[in-house]
C-alpha cells in the first residue's frame, strides 16, 4: 500500500541523513496512520530529541499518546499545535494574546480567563463539551465563539449566557484584553478536564432554541 511505500522511502532518505528530525517525524506519522503506535512513538521521541521545540513533532506525539489513552502526557504535547504556522495563520489574534497564553497545570478558581475557539466549527463543538467543567471550576470565564454558534451555546448554558461573546470581540482589542489574566485555546482545556477515560462522557450538551428548531422543522416539511 501507499503507507508501506512511504515508510520505505522515508527510511531510505534517513539512511542518507540520519539526524533529520523532519524525516524521522514523517516516519512516525506514517506508522501512526497505520496504527503502529509503539513504533510511531519511538520515532517521534527520537525526532523530539533532535528538535525539542518543533510544533509538528509535538503535535504528532500528542496524537499518539491520546490514541494510547495516555491523556496527561498527550495533552501536554498538544499545545505544540500553537506554534504551527497554519494555526498561527488561522488565528489572527495570536500575537496579541501570546503573552497571556497559559501553560500551567492548575486553573485558579478566581482567575480571569478568556477562552478562544479552535479552528473550525466542528472542533469548537467538540471542545465545547468541556465548557461546563470550566464554568463549574472557575468563576470569571469569558468564551469567544463563532457567531453562528453563539445562540446555541447561550441556550445550552443559560446560567452562563453572558459569558459568550463573538470571536475577536476581546482577543483583537488590547484594552479589553488587559482585563484578563490568562488566555486558553479551547483544545487546551483537555489537560485540566479530560485526563482519564472516565472523564469522557457521551452526553448531549447542546440544546437549540425551541423557536429556531420549530422554524427549521417547518422549512423541512
Regions found by a protein language model. Name each.
Residues 1-221:
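Alpha-helical solenoid repeat scaffolds of the TPR/TPR-like class and their adjacent stem/linker regions
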Amino acid at each position: 500500500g501507499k503507507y508501506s511505500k512511504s515508510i520505505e522511502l522515508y527510511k531510505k532518505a534517513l539512511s542518507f541523513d540520519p539526524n533529520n528530525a523532519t524525516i524521522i517525524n514523517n516516519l512516525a506519522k506514517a506508522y501512526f496512520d497505520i496504527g503502529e503506535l509503539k513504533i510511531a512513538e519511538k520515532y517521534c521521541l527520537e525526532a523530539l530529541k533532535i528538535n525539542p521545540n518543533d510544533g509538528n513533532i509535538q503535535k504528532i506525539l500528542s496524537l499518539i499518546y491520546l490514541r494510547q489513552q495516555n491523556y496527561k502526557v498527550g495533552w501536554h504535547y498538544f499545545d505544540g499545535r500553537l506554534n504551527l504556522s497554519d494555526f498561527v495563520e488561522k488565528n489572527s489574534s495570536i500575537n496579541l494574546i501570546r503573552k497571556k497564553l497559559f501553560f500551567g497545570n492548575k486553573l485558579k478558581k478566581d482567575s480571569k480567563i478568556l477562552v478562544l475557539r479552535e479552528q473550525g466549527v466542528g472542533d469548537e463543538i467538540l471542545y465545547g463539551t468541556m465548557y461546563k467543567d470550566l464554568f463549574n471550576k472557575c468563576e470569571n470565564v469569558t468564551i469567544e465563539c463563532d457567531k453562528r454558534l453563539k445562540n446555541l451555546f447561550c441556550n445550552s448554558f443559560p446560567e452562563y449566557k453572558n459569558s459568550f461573546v463573538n470571536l475577536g470581540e476581546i482577543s483583537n482589542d488590547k484594552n479589553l484584553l488587559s482585563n484578563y489574566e490568562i488566555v486558553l485555546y479551547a483544545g487546551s482545556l483537555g489537560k485540566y478536564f479530560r485526563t482519564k477515560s472516565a472523564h469522557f462522557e457521551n452526553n448531549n450538551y447542546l440544546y437549540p432554541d425551541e423557536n429556531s428548531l420549530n422554524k427549521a422543522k417547518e422549512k423541512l416539511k
